[in-house]
């Protein structure tokens, strides 16, 4: 047993220190990033925010809506090959280039991914997703997928430390997904005692990834636009959002009426709700590690994503970053014990 004494930080522990800026307006800030990925050599241009691969967020409808903003969607893995064929038939490359094909690590998952990717050359992203990215099985699976798809962009996770980021990149991942337990409907930290404060995880993992020419996704922990900016400021190349994009008509969640008001069900992918739906219940050897909540129905996602991106632009103006890629270089975080004045409640 050993104890690390260094303090690790979450988004609530810091604020940006404002800096002199020559920008006159938020409209001058460029959020588009251009990436060339390490192993695949693929190029991608867009706004590096990703809707999470949860079946009450990462739907086909979400992918179509967010592509209008240049934003990506990690489409959840529970669509069938036939579902994908229909989606591909109805949408062009401008939508498909922003859709990630999510997969687990079983042999059936591998075959399904091959079948989906064979439908079109316009799909370029594969998201390999398991809860515990520290498994040697994941490293071996990344190697297998890389051998099968040498020209596709592969994301793999989730992990929270630089050593595992490096191992996954060396195995063939272009992008590593960072985050264990910070999500709004994730209870892994409570059920297992395992986790890592998200901002420190991003800072440390970004350093490891960038040293090898890889990229990271900050996955989870964001509850407001300011948190998204903090993730970018900490070095995240992409930021993945679940709860902030849940509850919309494009989210794919179940709509429930109570007392004349509409709500949408939102749940973690290791929750009892998810396992009842997709796995026939919680296996005897495991515990559910997610919660189920009802969110007030929020209408179209277009207003929400515009508000989030507007907040990130505003952050950039406060620190003098004319482009999103400059934000981390312009970032100085100050440690704080307060974030906002809640005398009239939270927004």
Curated annotation (Swiss-Prot):
Gene Ontology CC entries for this record: cytosol; GMP reductase complex
Positions of K(+) binding: 181, 183
GO MF terms, alphabetically ordered: GMP reductase activity; metal ion binding
GO biological process, any: purine nucleotide metabolic process
InterPro entries associated with the record: Aldolase_TIM, GMP_reductase, GMPR, IMP_DH/GMP_Rdtase_CS, IMP_DH_GMPRt
Reactions catalysed according to its record: IMP + NH4(+) + NADP(+) = GMP + NADPH + 2 H(+)
Record key words, sorted: Metal-binding, NADP, Oxidoreductase, Potassium
Active-site residues from the entry: 186
PANTHER family: GMP REDUCTASE
Known partners and oligomeric status: Homotetramer.
Family in the record: Belongs to the IMPDH/GMPR family. GuaC type 1 subfamily.
Protein name as annotated: GMP reductase
Native species: Aliivibrio fischeri (strain MJ11)
Gene: guaC
């Amino acid at each position: 047993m050993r104890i690390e004494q260094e303090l690790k930080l979450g988004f609530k522990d810091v604020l940006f220190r404002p800096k002199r800026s020559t920008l006159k307006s938020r409209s001058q800030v460029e959020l588009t990033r251009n990436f060339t990925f390490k192993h695949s050599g693929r190029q991608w241009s867009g706004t590096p925010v990703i809707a999470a691969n949860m079946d009450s967020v990462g739907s086909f409808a979400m992918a179509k809506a967010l592509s209008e903003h240049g934003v990506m969607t990690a489409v959840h893995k529970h669509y069938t090959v036939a579902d994908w064929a229909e989606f591909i038939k109805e949408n062009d490359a401008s939508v498909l280039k922003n859709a990630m094909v999510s997969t687990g690590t079983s042999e059936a998952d591998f075959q399904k991914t091959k079948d989906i990717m064979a439908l079109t050359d316009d799909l370029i992203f594969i998201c390999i997703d398991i809860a515990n990215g520290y498994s040697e099985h994941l490293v071996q699976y990344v190697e297998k997928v890389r051998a099968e798809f040498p020209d596709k962009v592969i994301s793999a996770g989730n992990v929270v430390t630089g050593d595992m980021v490096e191992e996954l990149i060396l195995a063939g991942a272009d992008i590593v997904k960072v985050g264990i337990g910070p999500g709004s409907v994730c209870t892994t930290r409570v059920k297992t005692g395992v986790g890592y404060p998200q901002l420190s995880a991003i800072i440390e993992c970004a350093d490891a990834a960038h040293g090898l020419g890889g990229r990271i996704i900050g996955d989870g922990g964001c509850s407001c636009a300011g948190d998204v900016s903090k993730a970018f400021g900490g070095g995240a190349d992409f930021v993945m959002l679940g709860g902030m994009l849940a509850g919309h008509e494009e989210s794919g969640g179940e709509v429930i009426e109570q007392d004349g008001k509409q709500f949408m069900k939102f749940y973690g992918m290791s929750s009892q709700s998810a396992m009842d739906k997709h796995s026939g219940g919680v296996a005897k050897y495991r515990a559910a590690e997610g919660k189920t909540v009802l969110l007030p129905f929020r209408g179209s996602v277009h207003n929400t994503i515009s508000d989030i991106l507007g907040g990130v632009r505003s952050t950039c103006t406060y620190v003098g970053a004319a482009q999103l890629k400059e934000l981390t270089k312009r970032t100085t975080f100050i440690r704080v014990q307060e974030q906002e004045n809640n005398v009239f409640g939270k927004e």
